[in-house]
Amino acid sequence: MSKVLFIKANDRPVEQATSVKLYEAFTKAYKETHPNDEIVELDLFAENLPYYGNDMLTAMWKAGNGIELSADEQKRADLVNKYLNQFTAADKVVFAFPMWNFTVPAVLHSYMDYLSQAGKTFKYTAEGPVGLMGDKKVALLSARGGVYSEGPMAQMEMANKYVRTILGFWGVNNVTEVIVEGHNQFQDKAAELVAAGVEKAVKLAESF
């Protein structure tokens, strides 16, 4: 039995959001084919995460150095550790997100900030930082209305690139992607492109 964490970073309704279509198709297929796995679903917009700023940085630094925390600092550290422990405990993690304005939604960026903790997801060494999450299996389900996999727009893609960079920093190398792109750019092919992506998501779920 595996512990699996499903993370959704899109609050648009499914009929309007391709990444949500991928998420729902993947989740349904995974549950049907892995009935004994322990699954946690995390809707980042519903979680309403506070931005990761000075208060949380200070709280986590003090906690990591054995310094007594105030009641407010302890509350903030507990919130970060809630998501951090949930992530580190998972054997498999699924991220579903759109590309908005060339990058990920702010809630996903905040979530990744929570998880980037020295001594937890990575550590510092004399030779440089070393990732600690190398045993994780990750799937990325994403959508972008234009074409960013090649051509002049490729350099502007900072959504999947960002997530993969952070995961790599944490030592995660087992990453599989399902990307739907161009469905807004090529309206006449939109249904076909989305359907193909959903089919890929289902197949990935069955073998994930």
Curated annotation (Swiss-Prot):
Keywords: Flavoprotein, FMN, NAD, Oxidoreductase. InterPro entries: Flavodoxin_fold, Flavoprotein-like_sf, FMN-dep_NADH:Q_OxRdtase_AzoR1, NADH:quinone_OxRdtase_FMN_depd. Pfam families: Flavodoxin_2 (PF02525). The keyword Cytoplasm does not apply. Gene3D superfamilies: 3.40.50.360. Binds 1 FMN per subunit. GO terms for molecular function: electron transfer activity; FMN binding; oxidoreductase activity, acting on NAD(P)H as acceptor; oxidoreductase activity, acting on NAD(P)H, quinone or similar compound as acceptor. The keyword Ribosomal protein does not apply. Its EC number is 1.6.5.-, 1.7.1.17. Its cofactor is FMN. It catalyses: 2 a quinone + NADH + H(+) = 2 a 1,4-benzosemiquinone + NAD(+); N,N-dimethyl-1,4-phenylenediamine + anthranilate + 2 NAD(+) = 2-(4-dimethylaminophenyl)diazenylbenzoate + 2 NADH + 2 H(+). FMN binds at M99, W100, N101, F102. It comes from the Bacteria. PANTHER family: FMN-DEPENDENT NADH-AZOREDUCTASE 1, FMN-DEPENDENT NADH:QUINONE OXIDOREDUCTASE. Homodimer. NCBIfam families: PRK13556.1. Quinone reductase that provides resistance to thiol-specific stress caused by electrophilic quinones. Also exhibits azoreductase activity. Catalyzes the reductive cleavage of the azo bond in aromatic azo compounds to the corresponding amines. Belongs to the azoreductase type 1 family. This is FMN-dependent NADH:quinone oxidoreductase. It comes from Brevibacillus brevis (strain 47 / JCM 6285 / NBRC 100599).
